């Protein structure tokens, strides 16, 4: 059986690390448009995965605090992806 709580904990730790690293990457004046596009794509994939994880946790009847943690993770990745999209937009102007 899949250990959804373990997956959530691992993904949350990764999300926290990304929350620290992504702003630094985007602030780097040497980052290329291709790198930002790749980062955006990866963050979008993580946001999609976090959404699927949340849906699985809901489906299997996990408690509200667990679902809430998954929602926060999903929001974190969506926010990071939005930051990358804004950087990409600024680079194209």
Regions found by a protein language model. Give the residues of each.
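Short terminal alpha-helical segments
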Residues: 1-31
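Short, low-complexity interaction segments enriched in Ser/Thr/Pro/Gly
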Residues: 6, 34, 84-86
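Short amphipathic alpha-helical heptad-repeat segments
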Residues: 7-18, 36-53
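Generic detector of low-complexity/intrinsically disordered segments
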Residues: 10, 28, 45, 59, ...
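Amphipathic, soluble alpha-helical interaction motifs
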Residues: 21, 25, 52-56, 60, ...
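Charged, low-complexity interaction regions
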Residues: 25-36, 58-68, 93
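Amphipathic alpha-helical binding modules
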Residues: 66-93
């Amino acid at each position: 059986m899949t250990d959804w709580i373990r997956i959530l904990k691992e993904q949350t730790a990764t999300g926290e690390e990304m929350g620290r690293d992504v702003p630094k990457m985007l602030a780097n004046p040497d980052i290329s448009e291709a790198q930002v596009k790749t980062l955006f794509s990866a963050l979008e994939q993580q946001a999609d995965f976090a959404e699927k994880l949340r849906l699985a946790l809901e489906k299997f009847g996990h408690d509200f605090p667990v679902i809430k943690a998954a929602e926060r993770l999903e929001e974190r990745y969506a926010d990071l992806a939005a930051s990358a999209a804004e950087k990409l937009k600024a680079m194209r102007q």
